[in-house]
Amino acid sequence: VELTGSNGWKIGGMVKGSGMIAPQLATMLCVITTDAVVSAGQMQAALAVAAEHSFNRIDVDGCMSTNDTVLLLASGASGVEPDKDEFNKLVREACVSLSRQIIGDGEGASHDIRITVTGATSEDAALACGRAVAASNLLKCAISGNDPNWGRIVSSLGTVPPEVAPYDSNKVTVDVNGVRICENGGAGRDRSEVDMTCLLYT
């Protein structure tokens, strides 16, 4: 991936590894470089936030490894000191792009699923719910068979301890690619209306 800042500075990166990819520890090596003039402290802060919202949230096979490295290097060759917010934004965009490419390269991968949780009591609660859905082998089987089975999504939420993510099952709504197949804990539109040939948004 290569991105360009408003003053002409650039940031780019490459990543290797798409097996043993699970949140926070994975068999992967990622190197991101920039020609911007930035301090080590600024790079560390930007990368920590970016990694938390990209590499630390992807899951290919549910298996972890300790061989996990993401590097951000700056040469300063452009002579440009970028706006801090823009730098943070582009670091995050680079990490998100690279992490999604890992997903696409997963061994035997046939579907790319993006899970968004709204209405949770906290970000930690939302993350716990999202990871429970992503880890569901029953859901993976359903998706592999091009069946957006909302019951398996809802049941996976039940594996999250209520003290971690309290919720009312009668208020759960599930949309898949813009089609509301579950509303207030019950059946919504027919799941046959969901287009399963494209990137899945749940």
Predicted regions and their residues:
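A glycine- and small/hydrophobic-rich beta-loop-beta segment
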Residues: 76-145
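Conserved small/polar residues in nucleotide/adenosyl-binding loops
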Residues: 201-202
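Short acidic, glycine/serine/threonine-rich loops at helix termini
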Residues: 22-27, 43, 126-128, 154-155, ...
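C-terminal hydrophobic structural anchor segments
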Residues: 139, 143-197
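Short glycine-rich or small-residue beta-strand-to-loop segments that form or flank ligand, phosphate
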Residues: 12-15, 29-34, 70-75, 112-119
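Glycine-rich, mobile lid/loop segments that gate access to catalytic sites or pores
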Residues: 1-53
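Acidic, glycine-rich loop-and-beta core segments that form the ion-binding/anion-interacting portion
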Residues: 42-98
